[in-house]
C-alpha cells in the first residue's frame, strides 16, 4: 500500500495552509487556515474492510518549561514524545482519498465536535485537548484534525507522520477515551497493511533550527 498527497511529497515541508500556525516576524507565529491535507492511497490489500488514519508528531518536547519563552531555546537533544494531530476511523473500504479541507478548514476554539463525522466516520481526540486544557479561551475536546504548531523556539525540525492502516474490520472497537494510545491499542491484530507519509514543519527562524 502507498500513501501520497497533492499537498507535499514525502519528507518535504508541509505548506502553511495545512498548519495551525505560520511564522510571523513580529509575533513569532500567527494562526493559519488549519486545513487537513489531501491524502490518497493505492495497492490496497485483499480483504480490507475499512481504513484508519493516524497523524502524529514524534518530536514534541517532553518538558515544556522553555517552550515559546523569550530568550530561551528548546534544545535539540531534549527527549521527545508523541503528539497526535489526527485520528480518523471507519474509513470506507472503497475510499481511496481524502479531499483537502474536508475535515478541517479553520481553527475551532474549544475544539471541533465528535466523534461522529460525515459519512459515518469517527474522529478521535487529538492532543490539543491536553495542550489547551488550562486555557479558558481554548480548552475543550479537540476532535479531528488540527495541524502543526511546533514551538517557535525549538531547535528541532518537527516531523508529521500520516499513517494509513488497512483493517480486517469495518468498525474498530476502541476501549476508553478515543485518543492516540487507545486507537493504537485497538489496531493490534487487525492491520492487513500500512503506509506512511511524512511532512516536516517548523516555526523557528533559520538561525535557530538544527537539522539532525
Language-model regions, residue ranges each:
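N-terminus-centered regions that define maturation/targeting leaders and the start
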Residues: 1-212
Amino acid at each position: 500500500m502507498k500513501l501520497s498527497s497533492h499537498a507535499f511529497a514525502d519528507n518535504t515541508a508541509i505548506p502553511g495552509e495545512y498548519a495551525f500556525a505560520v511564522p510571523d516576524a513580529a509575533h513569532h507565529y500567527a494562526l493559519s487556515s488549519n486545513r487537513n491535507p489531501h491524502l490518497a492511497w493505492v495497492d490496497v490489500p485483499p480483504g480490507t474492510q475499512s481504513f484508519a488514519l493516524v497523524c502524529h508528531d514524534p518530536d514534541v518536547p517532553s518538558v515544556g518549561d522553555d517552550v515559546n519563552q523569550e530568550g530561551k531555546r528548546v534544545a535539540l537533544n531534549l527527549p521527545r514524545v508523541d503528539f497526535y494531530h489526527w485520528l480518523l476511523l471507519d474509513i470506507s473500504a472503497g475510499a481511496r482519498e481524502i479531499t483537502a479541507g474536508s475535515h478541517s478548514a479553520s481553527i475551532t476554539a474549544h475544539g471541533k465536535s465528535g466523534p461522529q463525522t460525515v459519512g459515518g466516520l469517527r474522529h478521535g481526540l487529538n492532543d490539543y485537548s491536553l495542550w489547551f486544557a488550562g486555557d479558558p479561551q481554548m480548552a475543550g475536546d479537540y476532535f479531528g484534525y488540527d495541524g502543526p504548531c511546533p514551538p517557535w523556539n525549538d531547535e528541532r525540525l518537527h516531523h508529521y507522520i500520516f499513517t494509513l492502516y488497512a483493517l480486517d474490520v469495518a468498525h474498530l472497537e476502541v476501549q476508553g477515551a478515543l485518543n492516540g494510545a487507545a486507537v493504537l491499542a485497538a489496531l493490534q491484530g487487525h492491520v492487513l497493511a500500512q503506509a506512511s507519509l511524512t511532512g516536516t514543519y517548523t516555526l523557528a527562524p533559520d538561525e535557530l533550527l538544527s537539522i539532525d
